[in-house]
Structures are given as C-alpha cells and as structure tokens.
C-alpha cells in the first residue's frame, strides 16, 4: 500500500479507471458477440441494428485508448463483411 498521500490518491484513481475501462471493454465485446450470434442465426435486419451499436462501442473504446484504432476498424470491417454475406 502506498504511504505518500498523492500515491494513495493515484491508487484510488487508477482502481476506478481500471473498473470503468474493464466494464467498457466488456460491453464492447458483448456487442460484437451479439452481432456474431445474429449472423449465425441468419437474422440480417437484427444483425444490422446490432452492428450499429457494436460500431459505436468499438469507436468509443478506440477513442478512449482501450483498443487500438486499427483493431476497431478491422473488427468493424469483419462484422460488416459477415453481415453482407447473408
């Protein structure tokens, strides 16, 4: 445990950010998995609606630095290709 006051504050802040970041990443992964599940079912309309939400989550995670912007683009491209193949 930190002894210096500023280090204690930084530890608290880091823990809060770690929890928030992990929640944001989990929501992003869930949105992507939902699109994949709908594609496997063959439900194109629902998959397109879920794709909009997944795109939003991926872009937000990339802008916050949770994932690299290229990974966000790659994931969006792959999801779009799967939907287009339906």
Swiss-Prot record:
GO terms for biological process: translation. InterPro entries: Ribosomal_bS20, Ribosomal_bS20_sf. Keywords: Ribonucleoprotein, Ribosomal protein, RNA-binding, rRNA-binding. It comes from the Bacteria. Disulfide bonds: none annotated. One of its GO terms (cellular component) is cytosol. GO terms for molecular function: small ribosomal subunit rRNA binding; structural constituent of ribosome. Residues 1-25 are annotated as: Disordered. Pfam families: Ribosomal_S20p. SUPFAM superfamilies: Ribosomal protein S20. Belongs to the bacterial ribosomal protein bS20 family. Binds directly to 16S ribosomal RNA. This is Small ribosomal subunit protein bS20. It comes from Exiguobacterium sp. (strain ATCC BAA-1283 / AT1b). The gene is rpsT.
